[in-house]
Regions:
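ATP-dependent NMP and nucleoside kinases share a basic, alpha-helical "lid"
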Residues: 8, 37, 100-152
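ATP-binding Walker
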Residues: 22
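Small-molecule kinase domains that catalyze NTP-dependent phosphoryl transfer to phosphate-bearing small molecules
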Residues: 128-130, 137-231
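Extreme N-terminal, non-catalytic leader segments
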Residues: 1-14
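Post-Walker A helix-loop "phosphate-sensing" segment adjacent to the P-loop in P-loop NTPases
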Residues: 32-39
């Protein structure tokens, strides 16, 4: 039995995609009460950064990721994106982090996982291959700031290594990891529109997982949208 067959048969995975500050980590924490263990592609990257740069938990996991470190002269978010994309994805292979994540899930005794940082099309494809439900979190107030970059991508014919290098020069806002899924079709799960309070958003994430649990991971709300506030 291949690792993909084993994961599809023995593990239950939901995965959150969306832009930075859309609420992916919050959603992962919200569904932990259903037995889903939060896990991220970036977990090994954060361990590297804390070992090499001695960043604090708040700098790597908390609200200070985008703040420039006074000693190093760059932000933890920037160096994590550089290590994850420019160093590993672009030189070792685009599947390096998704294979790492699937290997960690496969070797774990836990059977339910919530992936909190899906950012690239190949990650969506690999996760769907093992039966994961992909949940797209949209936060309308942060979407418009990336529109100019989407137009530039269209002219270049998509995300290329050259484009990724250009994005790195623009900074974290325009990094390839923030825009690669903009036009990628997500064929499972649902959209959660995060346009209300934090409590409303957490409840929306829980309600979706309740439906997944009730229908034994069926695509009950496939193609629909769940709003975190009353429209």
């Amino acid at each position: 039995m291949s690792i993909y067959e084993r994961l599809r048969k023995e593990k239950k995975i939901i995965a959150f995609c969306g832009k930075k500050r859309s609420g992916k980590d919050t959603a992962g924490d919200a569904v932990a009460s259903f037995g889903y263990m939060p896990i991220a592609f970036a977990d090994p990257i954060k361990e590297i950064c804390q070992t090499v740069f001695e960043f604090s938990d708040e700098q790597v996991y908390g609200s200070r990721k985008s703040e420039v470190d006074e000693f190093w002269g760059f932000s933890p978010r920037w160096v994590m994106q550089t290590i994850g994309t420019e160093m590993f994805r672009n030189h070792i292979g685009e599947d390096v982090w998704v294979k790492s994540l699937l290997s960690r899930i496969n070797s774990s005794n836990h059977d339910k996982f919530a992936v909190t940082d899906v950012r690239f099309p190949n990650e969506v494809d690999r996760l769907q291959r093992v039966g994961a439900e992909i949940i797209h979190i949209r936060r309308p107030e942060i979407e418009p700031e990336l529109n100019p970059v989407k137009k530039w991508i269209a002219k270049q014919g998509g995300i290329t290594k050259q484009a990724a290098k250009v994005f790195a020069d623009f900074g974290p806002k325009y990094h390839a990891s923030e825009i690669s899924l903009d036009d990628h079709p997500v064929t499972s799960g649902a959209d959660i529109v995060n346009n209300g309070s934090i409590d409303q958003f957490r409840q929306a994430a829980r309600e979706y997982v309740m439906e997944v649990e009730k229908e034994d991971n069926s695509a009950l709300v496939n193609g629909g949208q769940i709003f975190a506030s009353h429209m």
